[in-house]
A protein has these predicted regions:
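Extended effector regions of multi-domain proteins
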Residues: 1-205
């Protein structure tokens, strides 16, 4: 993040629970930056699948005698609704896009790994104007069959519709996403609670 924060003016010292006073009488509102990366990946060909990987530990016993071992569980996200996912750092959740028809030198499907980094979840309520028009932001991962006209996660004209366009509308059909030409949509962002140090020009972070 960098740049110049949006500001509003009011009586110095007035209480604004959703803003930071930067100078006497000058506030910067709290806000979020939420982005979506459309990733059309062709891993050794166009027929790909997306796999969710989670880590877990067995109770102490035959499979985990000292309590320090853990395993992974893989789930193919075979349809659009199954592929609407949130991050879960407790399970070290990540996603792979693989080509199930091509193997590497040890016999596993070739692929790439998407590791979620620092991100946030929208604080705008789903029933708000923003929540309706940017419904894509309520999942961290979406997977769709590749369609050239499906370009923007909030639809082509988010300011000209009442809500529901883009990813929520397209994925309502629950199209298959296994072993086909797929697009991964990764949603990420951050909360920006302005500081006095952000004024007049933000540092780079």
């Amino acid at each position: 993040l960098t740049g110049i924060v949006l500001t509003l003016a009011d009586t110095p010292g007035k209480d604004h629970p959703s803003a930071t006073e930067l100078e006497p009488g000058l506030w910067a509102p709290y806000h979020q930056h939420i982005l979506c990366a459309r990733m059309d990946l062709d891993i050794d060909g166009t027929n790909n699948s997306v796999v969710e990987v989670e880590s877990f530990a067995h109770p102490i016993g035959e499979k985990n005698p000292y309590g320090g071992a853990y395993e992974t569980r893989e789930t193919i996200l075979a349809s659009e609704k199954k592929a609407q996912r949130l991050i879960d750092p407790i399970k070290s959740r990540f996603w792979k896009i693989i080509n199930p028809n091509k193997n590497n030198h040890v016999g596993h499907s070739v692929g790439y790994k998407l590791i979620p980094g620092h991100t946030t979840f929208p604080l705008a309520l789903e029933g708000s104007v923003l929540g309706k028009r940017a419904g894509f932001m309520y999942q961290h991962l979406w997977v769709t069959p590749n369609q050239d006209h499906e370009r923007y996660p909030a639809g082509d004209y988010p300011f000209q519709h009442d809500g529901g366009a883009g990813l929520p509308e397209w994925t309502a059909a629950d199209r298959p996403t296994e072993n086909t030409d797929v697009v991964m949509w990764y949603v990420f962002g951050t909360n920006h609670i302005p500081r006095t140090e952000d004024w007049p020009v933000m540092p780079v972070e």
